Amino acid sequence: MAHLLPALTPAKFDNQREVVLNERRQNYENRPYGLATMATVAALFPPDHPYSWLTIGSADDLRASTLDEARTFFETFYHPANASIAIAGDIDAGEAVDLVDAYFGDVPAGPGVGPVRCDAELSGPVHLLHEDRVELPRLYLAWHSPAMFAPGDAELDLIADVLTNGKNSRLYHSLVYTRRIATEVAAFQNSRELGSFFQVIVTAAPGHTLAELEAVVVEEIASLAAAGPTEDELERSLAQAEAQFVYRLQTVGGFGGKSDQLNAYAVFLGEPGYFDQDLARYQQTSVASLRDHVQRYLVTDRRVTLSVVPRGSTDLAIAGSRPVVVR
């Protein structure tokens, strides 16, 4: 934060650009299904929305970036006025504050960074097709959903659990165990500050099409929209959410540990001690509230549907999908 810019030479910048481009090739371009999330977010969010691309960026933008742009970006965002620090563990609070002052006290605060407000919505269904170097076709379904910590965020998180967590979950039992038309299925509430998205991902078993998978997913979501989960399903999902919450707090550092949670609550909510309220979001849900949020958000005509199929096997995709090129 304090000493990067004086050490950032053109040669070092060019070197790091190649490192990132190589990382992009390894983790996205050359990985099976690796470009699917890029295609999904580009369809969900408008081009000027910060979530319409992944953090790694596009290869064209990386190659076109300049040292001056990097300096301007760093000066705008990487300074104490836009930073938060959390220290957790067996420490002396006074000593910790003194050390923070010693290491960061002389760093200029920098300009204030105001909150970003970006709206995103789908006016209708979007059907995309991506041919990839894969053996089995895979279906990606995505909907806009409530932002992180917003009303409904916890409900959608629990719905994902009801749908795909465990062998008795609705979609696993129907797609993988009973009908055997899929090899794997997962659902997530991707919670984000400016707006989340709910996602279902299903990989077809050999000999089956993505239309077969889509029909079952739509059927199960319609069932949840009509009646919600059962009391037993809700109880199991709540127990799992509570167990995960407690498990994360057993670790002081790392992603999801005490220090990470303190910092997240401070940055996103202004309340570092939000632990009890965070857990209460889940404990206060009900069968009816989950049903209502499925009805409101998991709507077929406001959904991105991405078919990823083996090259030359476009017949396995959802009918009417348009080819998409991810750069």
Where are the model-predicted features located?
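Short amphipathic alpha-helices in soluble, non-transmembrane regions
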Residues: 1-2, 98-104, 213-219
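Short, polar/flexible loop-turn hinges at active-site or ligand-entry regions and domain interfaces
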Residues: 3-11, 27, 226-229
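Bacterial peptidoglycan biogenesis and beta-lactam-recognition machinery
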Residues: 7-10, 93-94, 104-110
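Non-catalytic beta-strand/loop surface segments
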Residues: 27-82, 102, 106-150, 161-212, ...
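Helix N-cap motif at beta-to-alpha junctions
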Residues: 90-94, 206-209
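Zinc-dependent metallopeptidase catalytic helix centered on the HExxH motif
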Residues: 153-154
